[in-house]
Each structure stands twice: as structure tokens, then as C-alpha cells.
């Protein structure tokens, strides 16, 4: 099964630059033919950082990289755990546009703590509650 996943705890190699990370990922999970990488890096606010090591990125920048890698591929299943973690308002806007552009034809499972923006595009909702 081919799955795209994004979560705050998904590790990225901190010694790689953004450019190296994207090239490495692309070897295993090619981007769709209509995917314009430079355009999406700009929308993510990452264009000026493509030669910088990920170890210099903020938590919000790293989350945008994780989302980009998970969503912008041809995987039929997408798992997103707390996708808005560490994102500012611009990051939330980027997430929404990325989902609308690439993910709506996929099966998406979102783990969320009730942030409607994280799953507003979902057609079904399952509420899991812990009872003591």
C-alpha cells in the first residue's frame, strides 16, 4: 500500500538542505506531472531557503515541508496527524490550497484535536472519545 503521511513527529534529515530533501524524496515518490515545485515552494514561503539545511528551519517551516512531501505525490491514501501543528495563518492558507489542489481525489484520514480547518474538506467525520 502506498501512503503519504505528514505529522509533526515525522523526522526529516536535518543535515539535508531543502533541495536535497526534495531530490531524495522524488526518487521514491515522484511528484505529479502537473506539479510545479518552484510555485509551491513560493506558496509555502520556502523559496529563499532551498539551499539551507533543515536544521535551520523553524517548526512551522518543517511542517510545511512535511505536508508538501506527503500531499504532492501520487499516493492514493493520505494520513495527516495534526496537520496544522506549528503553522501560522500563512501556513494554514498554504495547507488549504495544497489540499484543494492535490488531495481531494485521495482517501484522507486526519487525526485532529477539533480544529475544523484541519478537516473541513472531509466528507465523513468519526469522533473518538475517551471514556473513564
Positions of predicted regions on the chain:
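ABC nucleotide-binding domain signature
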Residues: 1-10
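Q-loop/switch helix immediately C-terminal to the Walker
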Residues: 9, 14-30
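Conserved ABC ATPase "signature" region
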Residues: 23, 34-49
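Conserved ABC ATPase signature
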Residues: 53-60
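Hydrophobic anchor residue at the start of the ABC signature
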Residues: 67
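ABC-family nucleotide-binding domains
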Residues: 81, 87-88
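Conserved catalytic loops of ABC-family nucleotide-binding domains
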Residues: 98-119
Amino acid at each position: 500500500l502506498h501512503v503519504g503521511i505528514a505529522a509533526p513527529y515525522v523526522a526529516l534529515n536535518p543535515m539535508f538542505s531543502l533541495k536535497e530533501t526534495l531530490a531524495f524524496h522524488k526518487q521514491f515518490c515522484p511528484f505529479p506531472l502537473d506539479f510545479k515545485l518552484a510555485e509551491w515552494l513560493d506558496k509555502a514561503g520556502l523559496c529563499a531557503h532551498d539551499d539551507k539545511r533543515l536544521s535551520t528551519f523553524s517548526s512551522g517551516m518543517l511542517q510545511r515541508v512535511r505536508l508538501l512531501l506527503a500531499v504532492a505525490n501520487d499516493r492514493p491514501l493520505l494520513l495527516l496527524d495534526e496537520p496544522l501543528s506549528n503553522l501560522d495563518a500563512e501556513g494554514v492558507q498554504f495547507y488549504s490550497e495544497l489540499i484543494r489542489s492535490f488531495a481531494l481525489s485521495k482517501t484522507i484520514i486526519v487525526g485532529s484535536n477539533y480544529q475544523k480547518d484541519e478537516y473541513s474538506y472531509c466528507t465523513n467525520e468519526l469522533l473518538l472519545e475517551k471514556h473513564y
